[in-house]
Amino acid sequence: MASRMGMVAIVSLFVCALAASTSVNANVWQTDDIPVVNSNMVRHSNMERQQQQGGFIGHRPRLASFNRASNQDGDRKRTVPSGPDHMHHSIPSHTPQHPPVYVQALYEDDRSRTSSGPSKSIGPPPLSDRY
């Protein structure tokens, strides 16, 4: 069992190493840049590196920002609409416009409504005089 687990670990490491060596992102670790003091040269070398890595020339999409919205709006709170969204929560046309009428069900245990005899009072049982 231990030899089988060792074999699985070796094969998985081999697959990961193979995937890392053939992926496009593998050349991120292979940088041949020489440190440059001039800021124009640094910007130029960064542009060249970005174009070489992905083959992408032009405007790069902006990454998502996780800054709070209050920082962008001058520290004022965002207005949030209250109440239901009428576009998604409209009243369907097939529902009746009047409230439903509920009919009270008659039960066999309710003798006060089904019979005309004396009604049975509901309450605690009478105390016995056994003291």
From Swiss-Prot:
Region feature (Disordered): 49-131
GO molecular function terms attached to this record: receptor serine/threonine kinase binding
One GO cellular component term: apoplast
Entry annotated with the keyword Transcription regulation: no
Hydroxyproline: residues bearing it: P81, P84
Keyword Lipoprotein: no
Keywords linked to the UniProt accession: Developmental protein, Differentiation, Glycoprotein, Hydroxylation, Secreted, Signal
GO biological process, alphabetically ordered: cell-cell signaling involved in cell fate commitment
Known glycosylation sites: P84
Signal peptide: 1-26
UniProt similarity note: Belongs to the CLV3/ESR signal peptide family.
Protein name from the UniProt record: CLAVATA3/ESR (CLE)-related protein ESR1
Encoding gene per record: ESR1
